[in-house]
Swiss-Prot record:
Quaternary organization: Homodimer.
Name of protein: Pantothenate synthetase
Localization of this protein: Cytoplasm
Function: Catalyzes the condensation of pantoate with beta-alanine in an ATP-dependent reaction via a pantoyl-adenylate intermediate.
Family matches, as InterPro entries: Pantoate_ligase, Pantoate_ligase_C, Rossmann-like_a/b/a_fold
Protein encoded by which gene: panC
Organism: Sorangium cellulosum (strain So ce56)
Chain residues that bind beta-alanine: Q61
Family: Belongs to the pantothenate synthetase family.
Length: 296
């Protein structure tokens, strides 16, 4: 497996792979890799011949008071995991390489970035869009793979690629979950054992809405209120529990009657840790069984 620190080295390696007839796949990450990330690498491996993983804790997507300094950095362990997963190379630049002195360009995002996390992290998606554009420019992949846990990020990137006519297929990979249903996240490491137990309310809330939707419930309030109540009882605070159009991310009001597909997205804080998750009602299976079902 190759290891690149400089942007030009990533470009040269991907150019060389293409010249040899390989399809290039890109898996952008911020490191602290877990089984969810390894599933992204496997998906890229399945679709392409040369898989480049990027590990970069991108400062422009963190706001004031967020966890940039605290975010886990485990490069040596991550490199070993990438090699075992079959990556052909890892790009792990420092901040100065990606944002050299004098650089000032940012990618402006639109309406897709406005609701949900955009309300609470107003500069986040501009930072995401900027770094992803840089990485796509450097690697020139046929395919780039992102996790559906970060559903809004996935939609912002799809919009970016369409609007800028970038010749890359954006693949959204299924969320990988812990045995109790909690979505895998590098930030789960922040949770104490008690907080980790409380966080299980997230997949349970989503699962309850999935089952109600499957029974024919289409009133937004009837889907949202039980989820909000369950999360309010377990979380320190709630940023949002919303239903949205799965494509545009336009928010449906609590009084709406929704259609045959709907994104249910949540962001909560357990202690000081912000956790996000989602399901597409009408498409995704419940992320976890109800406790009574597990006991039967």
């Amino acid at each position: 497996m190759e290891f690149w620190r400089h942007p030009g080295d990533l470009r040269v390696a991907c150019d060389r792979a293409r010249a040899g007839g390989s399809r290039v796949g890109l898996v952008p990450t911020m490191g602290a890799l877990h089984a969810g990330h390894l599933a992204l690498i496997a998906e890229a491996r399945r679709r392409t011949d040369f898989v480049a993983v990027t590990i970069f804790v991108n400062p422009t997507q963190f706001g004031a008071g967020e966890d940039l300094a605290r975010y886990p950095r485990t490069l040596e362990r991550d490199l070993a995991a990438c090699a075992e997963a079959g990556a052909d190379g890892v790009f792990a630049p420092d901040v100065a390489a990606m944002y050299p002195p004098g650089e000032e360009t940012r990618v402006r995002v639109g309406a897709t970035a406005g609701p949900l996390c955009g309300v609470h992290r107003p500069a986040h998606f501009e930072g995401v869009a900027t770094v992803v554009t840089k990485l796509l420019s450097l690697a020139g992949p046929c395919v780039a793979v992102f996790g559906r846990k970060d559903y809004q990020q996935l939609q912002v990137i799809r919009r970016l690629v369409a609007d800028l006519f970038l010749p890359v297929e954006i693949v959204g990979a299924t969320t990988v979950r812990e045995p109790d249903g909690l979505a895998m996240s590098s930030r789960n490491a922040y949770l104490s054992p008690e907080q980790r137990r409380a966080a299980r309310a997230i997949p349970l809330a989503l699962a309850g809405a999935c089952r109600a939707f499957a029974r024919g419930e289409r009133r937004a309030a009837a889907l949202l209120e039980p989820a909000r109540a369950r999360l309010a009882a377990a979380a320190t605070s709630i940023d949002y529990v919303d239903l949205a159009d799965p494509e545009s991310l336009a928010i449906w009001s609590d009084s709406a009657a929704i259609g045959e597909r709907a994104l249910l997205a949540v962001a909560v804080r357990v202690g000081t840790t912000r956790l996000i998750d989602n399901v597409v009602l009408g498409e995704d299976a419940p992320p976890v069984a109800e406790p009574s079902e597990e006991a039967s």
